[in-house]
Structure formats: structure tokens, C-alpha cells
Amino acid sequence: MIDEIRDLLSRRLPGYEVGSVARLGEGLDNAAYEINGELIVRASREPAPDRRSASTRREADLLAAVHEFSPLPVPEPVFADPEAGVLAYFKLPGIPLMQHPVADPAKLAPALGGFVGRLHRTRVGKVEALVGRDFDPPTAWREGAERDYGEIEGHLSAAARRLVSGFLGRTPPAAPRAAAFCHNDLGAEHVLVDVGGSAVTGVIDWTDAAIADPARDLALIYRDLGAEVFDLTLAHYDGGRFDEADRERAVFYARCKLLEDVAYGLSSPGAFRYAGTSLAHLARTFA
């Protein structure tokens, strides 16, 4: 893949000298590479050419739109190659929160709350041509969580199994009443931070952005940063009404997504950090 990236850059950025190419890692949707310590090249893992091309083109157009109103920095594409499924942009400041936890995560709450609130206030008509709708009901989420639990149960302690089994035995929350524009994958791997200052410096990977339940964005803050930072984030959130039913769904999604990350991390080469991070957060997320 590195040779393919070199060839692609020679065609799309003529005159740009490629010195170093470093693989940064991969997630569920994409693999990322760093060029010369300054340029990020992200390659889609989608195997279907038509879907890969459409997704890459859509995300490039979406980033241009989001850049106009996001209160936090987002990638600005240098080029997109839909056929190859590649998007390139110069690095934003900061490093992924998943890899480098901050000393005082509470300091992240104002920026996260303001950011998520601004996304959720976006007029749906402004972005609906660029994103899909993602409305799997909570019952479908629980079915997915049950499958993931079946894959990972043997890796959990007895105490963790009791927590997860209790969760899966309860009735899922009611379906959401409202929809909003969501990043839809606002996990710690996609939040960039200044570790020394405990500050958010950007948000990356908009592949999964959709019109969806607003609780979906807040759910991953609960999963990755805990209930206290979640509550502080809500104190700075102005994206619309967010009541106890919304909170219940956010916690529900957080638990389902944690199980998904454990299953992914245990089954995918090079992705164990997803499992390790989620296992470390399991007790507090299911408490």
C-alpha cells in the first residue's frame, strides 16, 4: 500500500517530494498514513468500488461544508481520489485522545459541548445531500451488542460478565423523537488534543457522519471520558432539548459501542488498542 500511496501522490501532487511514509494505523473504516510528518493520506477499507468511491467523494464535499460552521478545526482536503478511496489533508494540530489521555479531561467538556451542540443545530437541509440517515432502532443495537458479547465473553472477568449480562437482559430504551446532523463516530480516536493543555484541537474522520439520533455523538463521550465529563459536556451543549430519555439512550449506545470496540480489537490484527481501551473502561461504563 505504501508504494501505491507514493504513486498516487506523484500523480495528484506533482512536485511534492515524498520523503517518509509512516503507517499510523487503521480503524473500522479507514487506514491512515503520514507523509513527511505533515500530510495525512487516508485510504478507505470499503471493498466495494462503487461504495468506496461514493463515500470518498461525499466526505470530501462534506468536509468543505462543515469547515464553514464547525467551531473546532476539521480536515481540509488537499485532494480526494474517489476511485482509489483516498483522501489527503495536511495534519491538524494535536494528537488523538485515544492514544494520549489528558491529565484533566474535564477541561475538554466546554469545547466538546459547544462543538456537538453546533453540529446538532445545523439545518438538516444544509447537509442532507451529503450524508445518509442512520436510524437503527435500539432493539437492533441490542441484537448487535449480544452478538459482540458472544464473541468476547471468554475474555471478560466474572464481574464484567455480570455487568454486561445485566445490561443485555434489560429492555432497550424507546426510539428517539428527533434527528440531527451528527459526526456519528465521535470516539477518542477521532478527537485531537493538546495533551499538555488538556484542550481539544480538532475532530477528524467524518466517514460515518449522518442524520441520526443526537444522543449518538454524546454516547461516545460517555464511553471514552466517563459520566462526569459527559455531564460537564451537557452543561455546555446547546443543540436542543436533551432530557432523561435522551440520556438513557446515550448511555445505552455507549455500552453497545464499547462491546463493539472490544470485539473489533480482539478480532482485527493491529487493532488491539481498541479492545484494551474499552476493557479498561468497561466497569465504569456499565456501572
Language-model features: locations:
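An alpha-helical support segment within catalytic cores of ATP-dependent transferases
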Residues: 1-17, 93, 109-110, 118-184, ...
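Short, surface-exposed alpha-helical segments at coil->helix boundaries
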Residues: 2-6, 60, 231
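ATP-binding pocket architecture of kinase catalytic cores
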Residues: 19-140, 153-154, 158, 176
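Active-site acidic catalytic loop and adjacent metal/ATP-binding pocket
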Residues: 25-35, 41, 77, 168-216
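Helix-rich C-terminal or lid/interface subdomains of diverse kinases
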Residues: 26, 97, 208-214, 219-287
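FAD-dependent flavoprotein oxygenase/oxidase catalytic domain
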Residues: 29, 69, 74, 83, ...
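Short strand-connecting beta-turns/loops that link adjacent beta-strands
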Residues: 82-84, 195-198, 258
